[in-house]
């Protein structure tokens, strides 16, 4: 069964749709300048696909927490959990097929990177017999893959880069 996610209109006025099954079989990078509509496009994609596929959103700015109330995503406030607790939450989300929003708002860059890496690590370390299609969205992904350590420790950068690499 093909699930067409309506994203807008073509220049000719016809509906522009994305095949969800095709999207889940590959990777997608949404890139653009500030104000170009990246967040709007991601929200549309998430809202349209929510009934069809498990989702995990890594949300550094709290922009997607409203999906919890509207679509039933479990919102996890990373600030309230240890790295080990977030790893366990990632494992449980995968096993029980729960859509989640990992809210990283309020944490400094180091802790955002560490906690996102722990949660994603939990998702990926679960036995393969629990793997089902999942749409993973990392908003502001550049925050989790810095070219140099800068304001964060080398260890946090390494953990975060490892988690981002697992998504590829």
Please place each PLM-identified region on the residue numbering.
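N-terminal pre-Walker A segment at the start of P-loop NTPase domains
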Residues: 1-16
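Switch/coupling segment of Walker-type NTPase motor domains
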Residues: 16-20, 29, 43-122, 150, ...
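Pre-Walker A (P-loop) beta-loop-beta motif of ABC nucleotide-binding domains
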Residues: 24-25
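Conserved P-loop NTPase motor cores
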Residues: 29-36, 46, 114-168
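Walker A/P-loop
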Residues: 39
């Amino acid at each position: 069964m093909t699930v067409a996610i309506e994203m807008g209109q073509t220049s000719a006025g016809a509906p522009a749709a994305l095949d969800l099954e095709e999207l889940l079989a590959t990777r997608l990078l949404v890139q653009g300048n500030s104000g170009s509509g990246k967040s709007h496009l991601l929200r549309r994609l998430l809202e349209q696909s929510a009934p069809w596929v498990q989702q995990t959103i890594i949300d550094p700015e709290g922009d997607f927490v409203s999906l919890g109330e509207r679509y039933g995503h479990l919102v996890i406030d990373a600030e309230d959990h240890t790295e080990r607790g977030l790893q366990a939450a990632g494992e449980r989300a995968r096993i029980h097929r729960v859509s989640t929003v990992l809210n990283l708002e309020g944490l400094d860059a180091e802790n955002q990177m560490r906690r996102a890496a722990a949660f994603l690590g939990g998702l990926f370390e679960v036995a393969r017999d629990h793997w089902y299609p999942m749409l993973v969205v990392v908003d502001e992904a550049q925050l989790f893959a810095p070219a140099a350590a800068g304001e964060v420790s080398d260890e946090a950068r390494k953990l975060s880069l490892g988690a981002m690499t697992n998504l590829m």
